[in-house]
Amino acid sequence: MLQISHLYADYGGKPALEDINLTLESGELLVVLGPSGCGKTTLLNLIAGFVPYQHGSIQLAGKRIEGPGAERGVVFQNEGLLPWRNVQDNVAFGLQLAGIEKMQRLEIAHQVLKKVGLEGAEKRYIWQLSGGQRQRVGIARALAANPQLLLLDEPFGALDAFTRDQMQTLLLKLWQETGKQVLLITHDIEEAVFMATELVLLSSGPGRVLERLPLNFARRFVAGESSRSIKSDPQFIAMREYVLSRVFEQREAFS
């Protein structure tokens, strides 16, 4: 379980997050949404252990987070892949740094690439891949270390609408198969409503938790309902419009 208690953080000398309290249970998919500048990415970087926080506590499985760790896998919008390495070696790179022997890490890479739909692409280079394929490699790399918690920072923001829909459904299937805790940062309201088991709305900066909304659309999808059917459901449309109105309220307040 991820537990965040009374978290305060600065960014560039200015308050970024104020009194954040969140809990992410095992097997849940938490989505954080808010206007630009609300501290979404700062929150993810704090959980990942990339930057220090001023006050409060972040704990995963009862252990305080004070730096990066293999129990947390991170996927970024820009992927951060190594262009001089092929797909297989990109996925296995972290395992190599961890001292895992070659045959084992290549087998792990093969298995996670199969999970993300890239079986057979092991020897291709990053420049030979589409944007969606590169994000699949980024997700596979994060999964290779078998983390407890998967953190994703707007991973589909630069993709076209069709590819973004494919990646959303892939992530939901991986979430169902692995049972991992997932925290997704996004600025896309429809994506947030579709994918979250709990949606957290942040205020304009400094970010505070405005509202926490339990949702069931992701569970409906993994139970077999199509994304098209879900997104055309009046309940989904009403929730999307409600969330949109809350985000607009914050944008107007900030401006």
From Swiss-Prot:
Keywords: ATP-binding, Cell inner membrane, Cell membrane, Membrane, Nucleotide-binding, Translocase, Transport. Its EC number is 7.6.2.7. It is found in: Cell inner membrane. GO terms for molecular function: ABC-type taurine transporter transporter activity; ATP binding; ATP hydrolysis activity. Pfam families: ABC_tran (PF00005). ATP binds at G34, P35, S36, G37, C38, G39, K40, T41. Residues 2-229 form the ABC transporter domain. CDD domains: ABC_NrtD_SsuB_transporters. It comes from the Bacteria. The complex is composed of two ATP-binding proteins (TauB), two transmembrane proteins (TauC) and a solute-binding protein (TauA). Part of the ABC transporter complex TauABC involved in taurine import. Responsible for energy coupling to the transport system. This is Taurine import ATP-binding protein TauB. It comes from Shigella boydii serotype 4 (strain Sb227).
